[in-house]
From Swiss-Prot:
Keywords: Cell membrane, Disulfide bond, Endocytosis, Glycoprotein, Lipoprotein, Membrane, Palmitate, Phosphoprotein, Receptor, Signal-anchor, Transmembrane, Transmembrane helix. The keyword Transmembrane helix applies. The modification Phosphoserine is found at residue 23. It comes from Gallus gallus. InterPro entries: PA_dom_sf, PA_domain, Peptidase_M28, Peptidase_M28B, TFR-like_dimer_dom, TFR-like_dimer_dom_sf, TfR1/2_PA. It comes from the Eukaryota. This is Transferrin receptor protein 1. Cellular uptake of iron occurs via receptor-mediated endocytosis of ligand-occupied transferrin receptor into specialized endosomes. Endosomal acidification leads to iron release. The apotransferrin-receptor complex is then recycled to the cell surface with a return to neutral pH and the concomitant loss of affinity of apotransferrin for its receptor. Transferrin receptor is necessary for development of erythrocytes and the nervous system. Acts as a lipid sensor that regulates mitochondrial fusion by regulating activation of the JNK pathway. GO terms for biological process: intracellular iron ion homeostasis; iron ion transport; positive regulation of B cell proliferation; positive regulation of isotype switching; positive regulation of T cell proliferation; receptor internalization; transferrin transport. A lipid is attached at residue 70 (S-palmitoyl cysteine). Residues 586-776 are annotated as: Ligand-binding. Changing residue 581 to H: In bursal lymphoma. It is found in: Cell membrane; Melanosome.
Length: 776
């Protein structure tokens, strides 16, 4: 037994069981010897072996060092193998359980283990053990179960019996206070944002439209509605009808009428926004614009007169590019989108009387609409004139945007924003009430899931109620302008809830390509209100992307995408062939909205799509953004450019560099996908860096070579101006249709801006600066 103990002692002891006292100082007598005291294993056990009674002066010799080292190596290898097997089996078990949870085939209770993580500043923090993880199938089922159609309709009743919620007025402020209090009941953080803006409102005298025949004046209408940002004053001119006021409509009419200078243009509502119609009329030389609602497209609307605005842009037109904070010293500038011509809306009955008094050529069948007495213009020698008196006045008003937030647990400084317009010129039930109702219900439900069901969103969710939306998304745009330096780096998606139900026949989707894949996935899990046995995805089919409606200036999501470079999503229901007749009128009431079949189910479906989008974007480790979709969009544009290669070369230019830039972007997408596949999914720092590269793709398509003050909508896909890819295509088309009108210097600039914006987006997506170069 003693020999066995001695053997074990020798095996696990690197040094002999002895200690030596060395003389530190040099010995004066030159003796460099040392004294050794040897302790045997037997001594430790208190055995009977005789103890040495003298000190050894000789050095102990190591024994069996080679054999001992061999045993140590074998023991270490065995321990390593055992540890590896234990870790592998444990990890495999967790992965299998996670897979069962994701597809809903098994139980879903996994408790995170504690691990030490390094954040971006280099400090070490311990991840605290939390409650069981809620997996996506369970989370979306919670949302669907908790959403209440009854609550949605109840939230609409706030607008019953109120004639107007005009921005900055008492009813708008009262609604803001109510929303603020509701947010306080549900959310972690609630705050207000004040802006001081210039709005054009009704004057002390009503506007008036009259017709003069041989000097005899007759009043056609004195409408209650106004068009904000119209030029005030009195103007007269010959009436000319230009259908919907599209550019192609003006091209057609200019072949019939020698000149439109000084005329009063008549257009019908639809196809494009009123502001775009007015801009086209101004470009053609018109002195004023009258717009009416045609019952062929809107149903029976003889007496309805819509409100509107004529600013070709968003935000406060008197502080373009600047936030309208009270302490800002504004420069004396105004938006280039202001029309400076008189604009007024009239009823279809007034338009019919006006047409009946015109004596020119009859409209073509495609232009007639519901008014069969439609005339294009008057005879050249006739003395028929239309007079437009506009008495609008400017007012300085304070508006409130209301915000509430659910803070994320892993990346609280990254957030998805859900917003809805609150104000309206009339009752605004469909225009603003439905979106606000969904906003409040989502705030309640998602807060309940977080507080009571244990869901811990990785990223924050911000709920926003905007004011002055009827004046051109003023509240939303001023917020973007005020916090642009922060928002483009932190807000990664905006979900618009405005006007989600304007009909029941068709689904209306407007979105950034980055969110197509997310939306397709969500629609597979939301029931079709028209047939609950199928999903929304089944209703639309696999080619639903082809039905995506481009965002317009009348959508509050537009400045988020085109001005700030934030991916956006807008979802709702409408009738494609018949506009909602009461929109922007005094008839936009709950009673009229109730005429839409299955209203409750439509509201619930729209709310569920928006809620699922917000939850999915805060649930997964990896952001649900499809970066490869923009590569497909670029390829589609490249196919449009191909027919003009020869004509471009004849000008001494080339499209090759533009094509090479697209290739660079595709390679950057492939590289990022490879980095994601090869990364450690459990490393929070790496995950955040990869997500940041994805979330900035949209922003990188804002042309960096343009001033946001002069060209606010800089997005090369969805912006407005000659820098866009669509404008480049239209310019190239002139090479075949009207070569003499091609501006060579502009074409050079367009090619350069497009090429280097795409190349810059590819470089940013590629990662660090040492991973990029300036070669194609």
């Amino acid at each position: 037994m003693d020999h066995a103990r001695a053997a074990l002692s020798n095996l696990f002891s690197v040094e002999p069981m002895s200690y030596t006292r060395f003389s530190i100082a040099r010995q004066t007598d030159g003796d460099n010897s040392h004294v050794e005291m040897k302790l045997s294993a037997d001594d430790e056990e208190g055995g009977d072996i005789e103890r040495p009674e003298h000190m050894h002066v000789s050095m102990a010799q190591p024994q069996r060092n080679g054999k001992r080292l061999c045993f140590l190596v074998i023991a270490a290898v065995l321990l390593l193998l055992i540890g590896f097997l234990i870790g592998y089996l444990s990890y495999r078990g967790r992965i299998e359980l996670a897979a069962r949870c994701q597809d809903g085939s098994g139980g879903c209770e996994i408790t995170p283990t504690a691990s030490y993580l390094v954040d971006g500043e280099g400090t070490v923090e311990e991840e605290i053990q939390g409650p069981p993880v809620i997996f996506w199938p369970e989370l979306k089922a919670m949302l669907s179960k908790k959403l209440s159609a009854k609550n949605l309709v109840d939230n609409l009743r706030w607008r019953v019996g109120v004639d107007s919620f005009e921005a900055g007025e008492a009813e708008d402020t009262n609604m803001a206070t109510y929303i603020h209090e509701e947010f306080r009941n549900f959310l972690d953080k609630v705050w207000n944002d004040e802006h001081y803006i210039k709005l054009q409102v009704r004057g002390s005298t009503k506007n008036q439209v009259s017709i003069s025949i041989n000097g005899k004046e007759e009043i056609l209408e004195t409408p209650d509605a106004i068009v904000a940002y119209s030029e005030s004053g009195s103007v007269s001119g010959k009436p000319v009808y230009v259908n919907y006021g599209l550019k192609k409509d003006f091209e057609i009419i200019q072949k019939v009428v020698a000149s439109l200078n000084g005329t009063i243009v008549i257009v019908r509502a639809g196809k494009i926004t009123l502001a775009e119609k007015v801009a086209n009329a101004k470009e053609a030389g018109a002195a004023g614009v009258l717009m009416y609602v045609d019952s062929l497209m809107y149903g029976i609307t003889d007496t309805l007169i819509p409100f509107g605005h004529a600013h070709l842009g968003t935000g406060d037109p008197y502080t373009p590019g600047f936030p309208s904070f009270n302490h800002t010293q504004f420069p004396p500038v105004e938006s280039s989108g202001l029309p400076h011509i008189a604009v007024q809306t009239i009823s279809s009955s007034a338009a019919a009387r006006l047409f009946s008094k015109m004596d020119g050529d009859t409209c073509s069948e495609g232009w007639k609409g519901a008014i069969h007495s439609c005339k294009v213009t008057t005879k050249q020698e006739s003395q028929i004139m239309v007079k437009l008196d506009v008495n609008n006045s400017m007012k300085d008003r304070k508006i409130l945007n209301i915000f509430g937030a659910i803070q994320g647990f892993e990346e609280p400084d990254r957030y998805v924003v859900i917003g809805a317009q609150r104000d309206s010129w009339g009752p605004g039930v469909a225009k603003a009430g439905t979106g606000t109702a969904i906003l409040l219900e989502l705030a309640r439900v998602i807060s309940d899931i977080v507080k009571n069901e244990g869901y811990k969103p990785r990223r924050s969710i911000i709920f926003a109620s905007w004011s002055a939306g009827d004046y051109g998304a003023v509240g939303a745009t001023e917020w973007l302008e005020g916090y642009s330096a922060m928002l483009h780096a932190k807000a990664f998606t905006y979900i618009s809830l405005d006007a989600p139900v304007l009909g029941a026949s068709h689904v209306k989707i407007s979105a950034s390509p980055l969110l197509y894949m997310l939306l397709g996935s969500i629609m597979k899990g939301v029931k079709n209100p028209a047939a609950v046995s199928e999903s929304l995805y089944n209703r639309l089919g696999p080619d639903w992307v082809k039905a995506v409606v481009p965002l317009g200036l009348d959508n509050a999501a537009f400045p988020f995408l085109a001005y700030s470079g934030i991916p956006v999503l807008s979802f709702g229901f409408y009738n494609k062939d018949e506009e909602y007749r009461f929109l922007d009128t005094k008839g936009d009431t709950l009673e009229n909205l109730r005429k839409i079949d299955n209203l409750d189910a439509l509201l619930a479906a729209a709310a569920e799509v928006a809620g699922q989008a917000a939850l999915r974007l805060t649930h997964d480790h990896e952001l649900f953004l499809d970066i490869g979709r923009y590569s497909e969009e670029l390829l589609a544009y490249q196919e449009e450019f191909l027919p003009y290669i020869k004509e471009v070369r004849e000008l001494g230019l080339t499209l090759d560099w533009l094509f090479f830039a697209r290739g660079d972007f595709q390679r950057a997408v492939t590289a990022l996908r490879r980095d994601i596949a090869n990364s450690d999914g459990e490393n929070r720092v790496i995950r955040r860096a990869l997500n940041d590269r994805m979330m900035k793709v949209e922003y990188d398509f804002l042309s960096p070579y343009l001033s946001p003050k002069d060209v606010p909508f800089r997005h090369i896909f969805f912006g407005k101006g000659p820098h866009t890819l669509r404008s480049l295509v239209e310019h190239l088309q002139l090479l075949k249709t009207n070569r003499s009108s091609v501006d060579l210097n502009l074409l050079r600039e367009q090619l350069a801006l497009a090429t280097w914006t795409i190349k810059g987006a590819a470089n940013a997506l590629g990662g660090d600066i040492w991973e990029t170069d300036n070669e194609f």
